[in-house]
Design a protein with these regions (language model features):
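Interface amphipathic segments
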Residues: 1-392
């Protein structure tokens, strides 16, 4: 496989130099004077130096520094034998700093498109992290990551009762400010100047919570005058979930500059239990509303979609009330049956073909029709009524 593969490590040119080695019971001391190696992937460690020390009470790594031709990392840590014996007592303190060069980032990430490798900034990824505590209470006292010119990320959190599957909990808060992230669009193998663009100067606030089997997440993205807000939760024991998405005045043209799509305001809410939609015990409910979408010369609004799943029967309703389209549609489908079993009823009271650019001039009367369809095992029935015209 391309890049570094932890399941296939083949080392060569290994050099190790140790000094002041001492070990007796809990008393230990070792000074790493020299360590270097090369991996088959191209990853190279040019230097690893540091010291490990322990006595009857404490275990220390006063300094451990690793260098590659493109990166450097250093770690300091201290803990107590008490933590080793009883992980919920004692205390661990650790600090980690790293500057990871482009070559090593791409190597560790594995097989990536050539367009992404070319577009990725030629600057080091700077990471700083710190933690204090034990498995009963662990604090993430500091965390930051920065790729100069691309993004800066900071955060912290708290982890509680990590060994207790029922009582464990976690709180993680992250803040991100973006600059030029357009190189990420090359992950799909296309050049960064293609149809999709990631705008500059976006802000992202994310909060994650866990309590036992319950997981919760909140996300707020701001881009210019636009905003995207997501609030979601999932219970791993009951498979109950909910999600609320609100988009307010988000300028999609900033993301798709070569398209004619502009401002979007919409909301989506979902709640349910179970993820096997063919099961009679699964329930789900969805409600979506399009308040405003500017596409080309069209201003689209007044569209609502609702849907439910209960007893393996999916039902959906679509209502459109705007200048382009006035209609009501209802549909249902049996999800658990091995054959097609569903029906559709569509009632269009006004379809403006002239405004849509299909008809050369306004129609004397608006186009209106009713369409119904049923699928029963291996047979499909359809019926269309438009004025005096009826088709089966």
């Amino acid at each position: 496989a391309e890049g570094f593969d932890p399941s296939h490590i083949a080392l060569r040119d290994i050099r190790i130099g140790l000094d002041s080695m001492y070990y007796r019971g809990r008393n230990m001391n070792a000074v790493i004077r020299e360590f270097s190696m090369n991996d088959r992937s191209g990853l190279s460690v040019t230097s690893l130096t540091g010291r490990v020390f322990a006595n009857d009470t404490i275990i220390q790594v006063p300094s451990l520094k690793l260098l590659t031709p493109h990166s450097e990392m250093d770690l300091t840590a201290q803990t107590y034998w008490e933590l080793v014996n009883i992980p919920t007592t004692g205390r661990l303190t650790a600090r980690f700093n790293a500057m990871i060069g482009k070559q090593d980032v791409l190597l560790l990430a594995g097989g990536l498109p050539d367009s992404f490798k070319e577009a990725y900034p030629f600057r080091p990824l700077v990471i700083r992290a710190g933690t204090e505590g034990n498995l009963k209470e662990m604090q993430i006292t500091r965390f930051s990551a920065e790729l100069p010119g691309a993004f800066s990320l900071s955060g912290g959190g708290e982890l509680l009762n990590l060994t207790d599957s029922l009582e464990r909990s976690a709180i993680i808060d992250l803040r991100m400010q973006t600059q030029n992230l357009n190189f990420l669009t090359a992950l799909g193998g296309t050049r960064p100047d293609s149809l999709l663009v990631i705008p500059n100067q976006m802000s992202l606030v994310a909060k994650a919570r866990m309590k036992g089997p319950q997981y919760m997440a909140q996300l707020l993205l701001k881009e210019g005058e636009g905003m995207l807000n997501l609030d979601a939760a999932y219970n791993g024991s009951t498979e109950a979930y909910r999600a609320d998405l609100k988009v307010d005045a988000l300028q999609l043209h900033h993301f798709l500059p070569k398209d004619s799509i502009y401002e979007l305001t919409t909301s989506v809410a979902a709640v349910g239990r179970g993820i096997d939609f063919t099961s009679y015990r699964t329930t789900a409910s969805l409600k979506a509303s399009l308040q405003s979408l500017h596409y080309g010369r069209y201003q689209i609004s007044g569209i609502e979609v609702t849907g439910d799943v209960k007893n393996a029967l999916a039902t959906a309703r679509l209502v459109s009330d705007n200048r382009l389209l006035k209609m009501n549609a209802n549909a249902e489908y049996h999800l658990a049956k091995p054959y097609m079993d569903g029906k559709l009823d569509m009632d269009v009271t006004q379809l403006d073909l002239y405004e849509l650019g299909i008809a050369p001039k306004p129609l004397k009367y608006p186009l209106a029709f009713n369409f119904t369809a049923e699928a029963r095992r291996d047979r499909i029935f359809t019926h269309l009524t438009a004025g005096d015209m009826k088709l089966n």
